[in-house]
């Protein structure tokens, strides 16, 4: 099951994808975390995040060559929007905190009132009783995703964002 971050992923996209990756991996699913687009991740903070937290993020240079048989989950983006390379898949799910851009599937969870997609994924993991606190690297990634997408917490306003920060602090 591939989980796709938007092209040129930021800390929030990587953290959110990693949260879903850990959940599905621990459920025994064969899961991959990937992204496509023109550029590989090169920013120092992101390469360190991926390396130090053991995030298995893979770059697809030729995404059209590997169609997905089954479900593709896009995270921190919406399939068909301008910031994500389309990977052919028989089924699409979208998890995002941005306003609706494209209606591409019935399997969408959008919460544009949140400061980060990491908050949305953290909330979903809490709903599933997934023990984020048992995975220090995942907790760190989700915390950093929220930190970066809320301008170092200066734009925290939603109670769910505040709950995530407190829960991972």
Question: Whereabouts are the PLM-identified features?
Answer:
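Short, well-ordered secondary-structure micro-motifs
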Residues: 44-45, 85, 105, 156
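Generic detector of well-ordered alpha-helical packing
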Residues: 11-13, 77, 97, 150
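Anionic-ligand anchoring segments at beta-strand to alpha-helix junctions in alpha/beta enzyme folds, i.e.
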Residues: 1-65
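A structured phosphate/pyrophosphate-recognition subdomain
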Residues: 1-8, 16-25, 103-169
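Short secondary-structure boundary/hinge segments and terminal tails
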Residues: 41-42, 67-69, 143, 163
């Amino acid at each position: 099951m591939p989980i796709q971050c938007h092209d040129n992923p930021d800390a929030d996209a990587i953290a959110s994808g990693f949260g879903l990756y850990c959940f599905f991996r621990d459920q025994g699913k064969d899961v991959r975390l990937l992204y496509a687009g023109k550029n590989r991740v090169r920013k120092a903070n992101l390469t360190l995040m991926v390396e130090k937290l053991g995030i298995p993020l893979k770059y697809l240079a030729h995404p059209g060559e590997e169609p997905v048989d089954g479900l593709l989950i896009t995270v921190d983006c919406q399939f068909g929007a301008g910031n994500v390379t389309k990977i052919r898949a028989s089924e699409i799910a979208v998890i995002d905190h941005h306003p609706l851009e494209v209606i591409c599937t019935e399997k969408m969870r959008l919460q544009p009132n949140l400061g980060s997609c990491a908050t949305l994924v953290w909330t979903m993991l809490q709903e599933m009783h997934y023990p984020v606190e048992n995975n220090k690297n995942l907790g760190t990634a989700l915390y950093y995703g929220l930190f970066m997408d809320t301008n170092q917490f200066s734009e925290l306003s939603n109670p769910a964002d505040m709950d995530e920060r407190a829960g991972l602090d």
